[in-house]
Curated annotation (Swiss-Prot):
InterPro entries for the chain: CsrA, CsrA_sf
Molecular function in Gene Ontology: mRNA 5'-UTR binding
Name of the protein in its database record: Translational regulator CsrA
Family recorded in the similarity comment: Belongs to the CsrA/RsmA family.
Length: 62
C-alpha cells in the first residue's frame, strides 16, 4: 500500500485521468473529492461491497 501525506487543498493523481483532492479534515473525518471520467466507477468501500454481493453470477458488468 502506498501511503501519502496531503494537506487540505492538495491533490494526488491516479493515472492520467483521476484526481483525488483533500477538501477538509474535521476530527477523524477527511472529506475528499474525486474527479474521474464517467466510465470509472467511484464508490465508498461499503457500497462497493454491497454492489458486489448483489451481483448475479453470469450477469455482464456494465
Amino acid at each position: 500500500m502506498l501511503i501519502l501525506t496531503r494537506r487540505v487543498g492538495e491533490t494526488l493523481m491516479i493515472g492520467d485521468e483521476v484526481t483525488v483532492t483533500v477538501l477538509g479534515v474535521k476530527g477523524n473525518q477527511v472529506r475528499i473529492g474525486v474527479n474521474a471520467p464517467k466510465e470509472v466507477s467511484v464508490h465508498r468501500e461499503e457500497i462497493y461491497m454491497r454492489i458486489q454481493a448483489e451481483k448475479v453470477p453470469g450477469q455482464p458488468n456494465f
